[in-house]
């Protein structure tokens, strides 16, 4: 769903909910909009930096401060949320054995404690450690590609297996990885039109700051000599 936005629209909670579930809406409508809007982050100016926005179900890879790749991902469910915050990319394991965590063993209740490498392994062809090993988090492939993107993992960040292999070969161990929760993005396109994307709230944080959005939009409009409908 796309529609022209106004400050009045941003003030109405019911209207904002419609926008959230519409996923993408346009401000100062143009025929050309970016397919994926970029979150409001300050990536590392040198080296690589991974940014995962839970609400977008997207992984953004930056090289020397510039966006180089966007991948769709599946993230943790509301009951098994992916840990927000600052992490580091850790060790990589190709053709990993899945040693099933006890919590998942209990959930499965089939007596299986591990799954060998192969087409039936939920980790896919590669597992990249995300953060402290004590968190048991990783960025990995999958044997269920239709589940990506989505909000359905036990906390790990799931990628389609070809993407996971590409990512693993590209990313350097020790690179910073930021897991964020931004419910809206504002980006300017090549035609100097401003686009707003608003996302679902899978962890029910209710932290969409419409006042900050209004302030940012007003500042942009003033800088570009444009008028926002009241």
Over which residues does each language-model region extend?
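N-terminal signal peptide c-region/cleavage motif recognized by signal peptidases
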Residues: 29-33
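Gly/Pro-biased beta-strand-loop elements
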Residues: 35-147, 166-170, 194-230
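Short, basic/aromatic beta-hairpin or loop at an interaction surface
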Residues: 145-155
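Sec-dependent N-terminal signal peptides
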Residues: 19-28
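Short beta-strand-centered segments at strand-helix junctions
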Residues: 153-170
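Short, Lys/Arg-enriched N-terminal segments with co-localized hydrophobic residues
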Residues: 1-15
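Short, charged beta-turn/beta-strand-edge "cap" motif at the junction between a beta-strand
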Residues: 80, 182-186
